[in-house]
Regions:
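Outer-membrane beta-barrel translocator domains and adjoining extracellular loop/strand segments
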Residues: 71-76, 135-144, 176-183, 232-256, ...
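Membrane-embedded beta-strand positions of outer-membrane beta-barrel proteins
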Residues: 58-60, 123-125, 163-165, 220-222, ...
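Outer membrane beta-barrel
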Residues: 43-78, 88-236, 262-275, 312-326, ...
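Outer-membrane beta-barrel "beta-signal"
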Residues: 415, 450-465
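Detector for outer-membrane/organellar transmembrane beta-barrel domains
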Residues: 261, 273-413, 417
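Surface-exposed loop/turn segments flanking beta-strands in extracellular/periplasmic regions
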Residues: 78-88, 186-192, 243-245, 342-347
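Membrane-spanning beta-strands of outer-membrane beta-barrel proteins
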Residues: 101, 146, 203, 263-265, ...
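Cleavable N-terminal export/targeting peptides
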Residues: 1-36
Length: 465
């Protein structure tokens, strides 16, 4: 009897061990440093909780970011590139310093193995703490608001056809290689600033996307994205006949979701890859702006949008990159740094032509350290007319407010170092960004011709396994 009991116990132990092995994914090699803010690429990484045919991964990082600026723009860990204060103001003569944990990030990812002749499914949620904050947030509790960044689902059919829906980076955002909706597959620089660098084309918007990948060398994608026509706050002078009507029809920074947009933005992009050595992509966005004024019986529509071309060359451990965009009415997609349109006294819509760029060199020093330098910026053409009263209106006219920027230019250097990494336990890293920034308005009046700032952002973070 004892012999049978011992045999039964051994058999049960063996079965339990087998089941445990089946429930635990094979260990993966410890990855090198990820010098960017983004934490999830299309290929799953890290340990997973296995539940039947699905794998669940909880990711993100916990960190603190120190910020120093030579002028006080009050932007927290996201810089207000378009409103750097001038030297003849109080804020232009005050530096600022703060520590913040708002960049800490939490993600939940689910990957489901495909059933026979069915799609491979994946879902992703990503949040941080850069949401709405109460006016006294920094006094005692520092209770920063939880914020949605990404939330999307994806279905891949035989590795060639992909359908994705949810909130994610716009298809106008520069990719690193193959067209993908996953955040780490975009070329968002090494910047610590949560607004990245001035001149970058990006946005996280609700969308439905279709991608066709006949090979790794060629991809094509089409995206239907949530629109939002915007003119900034106090940047565009509206015609006196209908300023109050028009203010409610364009996002001026305080409209929430009240703007009555006409139709979704349509974005398309193609990408060409030669292994990891060379990547080139090109695409564009079609937008339609709409408004109405008294007697409200003739809505006015105007098309706009823009084109962008991006390239990366990676010979070994160094990457040289260039991102260029141009178009009338493209301002929303360049971090909202330029208004989309101006409006003349006859009620016609005039898209503002905008040019932006990011060029840089990124170098992986070791598997634990990387460095990069970037030159970036945006230029907006002036677009104004004469009101019925005889005064100038629109954007960039002589005597326009100093918030109407002709150009914003930024030079940025970043160093990232992974102090330690332990398989299955995560890693500790330190990223530091130093930037010089200049904004030049179309009309400075009697004040200084431009506003300059130096910024240092340094972050220590623990990356969850």
């Amino acid at each position: 009897m004892d012999t049978f009991r011992v045999a039964g116990v051994l058999a049960a132990a063996a079965l339990t061990a087998r089941l445990g092995e089946a429930q635990t994914p094979a260990p993966q090699p410890t990855p090198g440093i990820n010098p960017t803010q983004e934490i999830a690429r299309e290929t799953p990484e890290g340990p997973a909780i296995v539940a039947g045919p699905t794998e669940i991964r909880i990711g993100g990082y916990v960190g603190v970011t120190g910020v120093f600026r030579s002028t006080a723009d009050g932007g927290g860990i996201g810089s207000n590139f378009a409103t750097i204060p001038f030297s003849d103001t109080a804020d232009g003569n005050l530096s600022e310093f703060r520590l913040s944990a708002q960049a800490s990030r939490l993600s939940i990812r689910v990957n489901a193995a495909p059933a026979p002749d069915r799609a491979t499914l994946a879902g992703y949620f990503e949040m941080d703490f850069n949401g709405t904050v109460p006016g006294n947030v920094g006094v005692t509790s520092n209770s920063a608001g939880f914020r949605l960044r990404n939330a999307f689902g994806e279905a891949q059919y035989r590795g060639r056809f992909i359908v994705a829906a949810g909130q994610a980076y716009t298809l106008m955002t520069p990719p690193k290689g193959q067209l993908s909706i996953w955040p780490s597959d975009y070329d968002l620089t090494y910047a610590v600033d949560v607004n990245y660098v001035a001149g970058m084309v990006w946005g996280r918007v609700p969308q439905v996307r279709f991608t066709y990948r006949p090979s790794t060398s060629f991809n094509w994608a089409l995206s239907v994205e949530n629109p939002e026509q915007q003119i900034g706050s106090g940047v565009v002078t509206l015609p006196s006949c209908c300023a109050s009507d028009l203010t409610g029809q364009y996002n001026t920074g305080s409209n929430g979701l009240d703007v009555a947009n006409f139709m979704p933005d349509i974005v398309s992009r193609v990408a060409f890859n030669q292994g990891k050595l060379l990547h080139i992509d090109a695409g564009g966005v079609l937008r339609v702006f709409r408004q109405t004024v008294k007697p409200y019986d003739q809505p006015v529509k105007q098309t706009g949008g823009g084109l962008s071309v991006n390239a990366r060359v990676t010979p070994g451990t160094t990457t040289v990159l260039g991102q260029f965009a141009y178009g009338p009415g493209l301002g929303r997609y360049i971090g909202g740094l330029v208004p989309d349109v101006s409006i003349s006294a006859d009620g016609q819509i005039h898209p503002i032509r905008t040019t932006s760029w990011v060029v840089g060199v990124e170098h992986r020093l070791t598997t634990q350290a990387s460095a990069a330098i970037y030159d970036s910026g945006v230029h907006a053409d002036r677009n104004y007319s004469v009101d019925t009263s005889g005064s100038d209106i629109g954007f960039g006219y002589p005597g326009a407010p100093t918030s109407a920027n002709k150009s914003i230019h930024q030079v940025t250097g970043v160093f990232a170092w992974q102090a330690w990494s332990i398989e299955g336990r995560g890693s500790l890293q330190w990223n530091t960004q130093v930037s010089w920034l200049r904004r030049t308005p179309w009309s400075a009046g009697t004040g200084p011709p431009s506003a300059d700032a130096v910024m240092v952002l340094s972050q220590i973070r623990y990356n969850l396994p």
